[in-house]
C-alpha cells in the first residue's frame, strides 16, 4: 500500500510497525453540535482506510476519539442551562446515528477525553519534570522552544507558525507560541462540572494534550498512522507531536500522518455567519440519502479540496441511479459468498486511497453488466459489483428499495398506453405521456426486452 505522508511530504510504501496489529489514531468529533459535512468527510475517508487495512492485515486497532470537554461544549451547556454531560450525551448519540447512515464502521475503540484525565495529568507531570512545560498562575504551558523539531510537521519555522496562524496570546507565556496543557477552573467550570482536581489546582485540560493521552493509552508510545483534516495540521497535530515526543524521548509518535482536504460550500468556507453551515442531519432530513453523501465524498480524492453544491448532489444521485439500474435483473437478494471484492478496487485503494478511480471501476462494471447477453454471466457481474460497492460502503439497497417502486395503477396504465402508442408508431403521444409522467416526478427507463422500469425522482 502506498500512502502520502504529510510528515515527509511524499508518497511512501506503508510498512507497519507490527504486521499483526496495525494501529491508527484519528481525531474524531467535538460534540457540541450535529456533525457538519466537513467533519463527516474525514470520518468517511478513514473508514475507507480502516476497511482496506482490514483486508490487508490480520488485525487493525482503530482509535477515533471524542472530544467531550471544550470551550464550545461549555458555551452550549451554559446557554442551555445544562451540564456538559447532558450536551455531549445528546451529540455523541446523534453523531453515531448519522455516521451509521453514512455506512461508516465503528472504530475499535472510541475513547472520550473525560475518561482519560488521569493519563493527561501523568503526561503533563512528565513534561514538567523533563523541562518541557512550566507553571504560571496555576496554568501549565508547553515550552515550544524546548523542542528543537517544533514545526517539522507543518514545515514552517516558529515565527511563521506564530504570525501565520491563530494562537492565543496569554499573559505569563515564555513564548507567544507556547500552548496550554492545563488551565484553572472558572466559576462556570465548577457549575457545569467541567473541571477536575490536579497537582496545579482544580481545572481542565487543554485540547492538544487530550489526543496525546488517548493515543498513548490505547496504542502506546508509537503507532502507525495518525489521521485528521488538513485544518488540524497546525496547531493541533503539530502540538500533539511535540508534546508526545517530549514526554517519551525515544518516541516518534506516529510514523505516517494523513490529512484530508478542505470542504467548501458553493466555493465559500462553511460558516454559520454565512448561512452555509451544513450538517449531515440537515441533509438527511432534507431527503438526501446517506449513500449519496458518502458517494460524493468518495468521488473526490481525499487530499483534494471538495466543493459541496447542488450540482454535485444531483450528479451523485444520477450516478447511483445508473449503478442501481444495473441491478434490475432479479427481484431476489443475491448471495455474495461465492464472489470477492474486485482486485481493481483494492488496487485503486492501495494507491493512496484513490477512491475516484475505484468509483470509475464500478461504472465500468455497470457497462459490462449492461452489455452482457448471457443471464448467468450478467448475474455474476452484478454480484461482483455489489460486493465491491459494499466494500466502499455503498449499494446496500435492492433496486426496488432504491427507486421506491410501488403498484400505482394510474402510472402503470399510462406506461401501458405509452407502450401501445410506440407500437402503433404514434411517437408524439408516447413522448407526451413520458412528459406527463416526468411532471409527476416519474422517471422511465426502457429496457432492451421491451419492459419499462420506472421510479420516483
From Swiss-Prot:
Transmembrane segments: none annotated. GO terms for biological process: cysteinyl-tRNA aminoacylation. Binds 1 zinc ion per subunit. It is found in: Cytoplasm. Keywords: Aminoacyl-tRNA synthetase, ATP-binding, Cytoplasm, Ligase, Metal-binding, Nucleotide-binding, Protein biosynthesis, Zinc. GO terms for cellular component: cytosol. Zn(2+) binds at residues 27, 211, 236, 240. The keyword Acetylation does not apply. A motif ('HIGH' region) lies at residues 29-39. Pfam families: DALR_2, tRNA-synt_1e. Its cofactor is Zn(2+). Its EC number is 6.1.1.16. Monomer. This is Cysteine--tRNA ligase. It comes from Ehrlichia ruminantium (strain Welgevonden).
Amino acid at each position: 500500500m502506498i500512502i502520502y505522508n504529510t510528515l515527509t511530504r511524499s508518497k511512501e510504501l506503508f510498512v507497519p510497525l507490527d504486521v499483526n496489529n496495525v494501529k491508527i489514531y484519528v481525531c474524531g468529533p467535538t460534540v457540541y453540535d450535529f456533525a457538519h459535512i466537513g467533519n463527516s468527510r474525514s470520518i468517511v475517508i478513514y473508514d475507507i482506510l480502516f476497511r482496506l487495512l482490514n483486508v490487508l492485515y490480520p488485525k487493525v486497532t482503530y482509535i477515533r476519539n471524542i472530544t467531550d470537554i471544550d470551550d464550545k461544549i461549555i458555551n452550549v451547556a451554559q446557554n442551555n442551562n445544562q451540564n456538559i454531560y447532558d450536551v455531549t450525551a445528546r451529540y455523541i448519540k446523534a453523531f453515531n446515528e448519522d455516521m451509521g447512515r453514512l455506512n461508516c464502521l465503528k472504530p475499535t475503540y472510541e475513547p472520550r477525553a473525560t475518561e482519560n484525565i488521569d493519563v493527561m495529568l501523568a503526561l503533563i507531570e512528565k513534561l514538567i519534570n523533563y523541562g518541557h512545560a512550566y507553571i504560571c498562575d496555576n496554568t501549565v504551558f508547553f515550552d515550544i522552544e524546548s523542542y528543537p523539531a517544533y514545526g517539522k510537521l507543518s514545515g514552517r519555522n516558529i515565527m511563521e507558525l506564530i504570525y501565520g496562524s491563530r494562537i492565543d496570546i496569554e499573559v505569563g507565556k515564555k513564548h507567544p507560541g507556547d500552548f496550554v496543557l492545563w488551565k484553572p477552573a472558572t466559576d462556570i467550570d465548577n457549575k457545569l462540572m467541567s473541571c477536575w482536581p490536579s497537582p496545579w489546582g482544580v481545572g481542565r485540560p487543554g485540547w492538544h494534550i487530550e489526543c496525546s493521552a488517548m493515543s498513548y493509552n490505547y496504542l502506546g508510545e508509537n503507532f502507525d498512522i495518525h489521521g485528521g483534516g488538513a485544518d488540524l495540521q497546525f496547531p493541533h497535530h503539530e502540538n500533539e507531536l511535540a508534546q508526545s515526543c517530549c514526554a517519551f524521548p525515544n518516541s516518534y509518535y506516529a510514523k505516517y500522518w494523513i490529512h484530508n482536504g478542505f470542504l467548501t460550500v458553493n466555493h465559500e468556507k462553511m460558516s454559520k455567519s454565512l448561512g452555509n453551515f451544513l450538517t449531515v442531519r440537515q441533509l438527511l432530513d432534507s431527503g438526501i440519502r446517506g449513500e449519496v453523501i458518502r458517494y460524493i465524498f468518495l468521488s473526490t480524492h481525499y487530499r483534494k479540496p471538495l466543493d459541496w453544491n447542488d450540482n454535485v448532489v444531483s450528479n451523485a444521485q444520477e450516478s447511483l441511479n445508473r449503478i442501481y439500474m444495473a441491478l434490475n435483473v432479479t427481484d431476489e437478494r443475491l448471495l455474495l459468498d461465492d464472489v470477492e471484492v474486485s482486485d481493481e478496487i483494492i488496487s485503486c485503494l492501495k494507491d493512496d486511497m484513490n477512491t475516484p478511480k475505484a468509483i470509475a471501476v464500478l461504472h465500468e462494471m455497470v457497462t459490462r453488466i449492461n452489455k452482457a447477453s448471457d443471464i448467468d454471466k450478467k448475474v455474476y457481474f452484478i454480484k461482483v459489483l455489489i460486493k465491491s460497492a459494499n466494500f466502499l460502503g455503498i449499494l446496500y439497497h435492492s433496486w426496488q428499495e432504491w427507486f421506491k417502486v410501488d403498484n400505482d395503477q394510474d402510472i402503470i396504465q399510462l406506461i401501458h398506453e405509452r407502450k401501445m402508442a410506440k407500437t402503433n408508431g404514434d411517437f408524439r403521444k408516447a413522448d407526451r405521456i413520458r412528459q406527463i409522467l416526468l411532471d409527476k416526478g416519474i422517471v422511465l427507463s426502457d429496457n432492451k426486452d421491451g419492459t419499462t422500469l420506472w421510479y420516483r425522482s
